[in-house]
Amino acid sequence: MHKEPMTKYGYEKLSKELEYLKTTARPEVAKEIDSARELGDLKENAEYHAAKEKQSHIERRIAELSDILSRAVVVDPKEHAHNRVAFGSTVYLIDVDTDEKEKYTIVGAPEANPDKGLISYHSPLAKALIGKEVGDEVEVNLPGGVKVYEIDKICYEDICFS
C-alpha cells in the first residue's frame, strides 16, 4: 500500500466529510429510496432512480475517502524548521520577470487546490521548490512556459479549506 503525506488540516477535512457521508448523507438517501419505492412501479419511478444514483455517488465517495485516509501519513509542518522548503511549507515567491508576488502551500495530492494556492507536492512547481532556501531562484516548466521565481519567504501557516 502506497502511503501519501497529508497535512493534519487535509486529514481533518476529509475525515469530517467521510463522517458526514456515513452518518448523515447515507441514511438520508436510504430514506429517499424507501419513500420513492412506496410510490410503486420502480421501472418508471424517476425519484427512485435519482435516489439510487445519489446513493451510488455517496458510496463511491465513501470508498474513495476511506482509501485516501487509510493511506495517509499525517505530517505536521509545525514540527519542521522552515529554512528550506518542505512538505507543508508556505512559500512566498517573486516572479523574476514580472515582480509579481505569489504564495503557495505544499500539500498532499487530495488536498491540492491550485486556485487557493494549495499545490500538490507532486506538481512541477512543488518539486522545483522542495529543498530550496530563501533567495534561491527556481526555474519551472509550466503549461504556460518556463517561469523563474525567487524564494522570498518560507514559513508555516494554518490552512483553511473553506
From Swiss-Prot:
NCBIfam families: greA, PRK00226.1-2, PRK00226.1-4, PRK00226.1-5
Classification via SUPFAM superfamilies: FKBP-like, GreA transcript cleavage protein, N-terminal domain
Keyword Transcription: yes
Coiled coil start-end: 44-72
Molecular function (Gene Ontology), one example: DNA binding
Keywords from the UniProt entry: Coiled coil, DNA-binding, Transcription, Transcription regulation
One Pfam family linked to the record: GreA_GreB_N
Family as reported in the entry's similarity comment: Belongs to the GreA/GreB family.
PROSITE patterns named among the record's database cross-references: GREAB_1, GREAB_2
GO process annotations (BP): DNA-templated transcription elongation; regulation of DNA-templated transcription elongation
Coiled coil found in the keyword field: yes
The protein's role, per its UniProt record: Necessary for efficient RNA polymerase transcription elongation past template-encoded arresting sites. The arresting sites in DNA have the property of trapping a certain fraction of elongating RNA polymerases that pass through, resulting in locked ternary complexes. Cleavage of the nascent transcript by cleavage factors such as GreA or GreB allows the resumption of elongation from the new 3'terminus. GreA releases sequences of 2 to 3 nucleotides.
Signal peptide: none
Organism: Nautilia profundicola (strain ATCC BAA-1463 / DSM 18972 / AmH)
Name of this protein: Transcription elongation factor GreA
Classification via InterPro entries: GreA/GreB_C_sf, TF_GreA/GreB_CS, Tscrpt_elong_fac_GreA, Tscrpt_elong_fac_GreA/B, Tscrpt_elong_fac_GreA/B_C, Tscrpt_elong_fac_GreA/B_fam, Tscrpt_elong_fac_GreA/B_N, Tscrpt_elong_fac_GreA/B_N_sf
Lineage, opening ranks: Bacteria, Pseudomonadati, Campylobacterota, Epsilonproteobacteria, Nautiliales
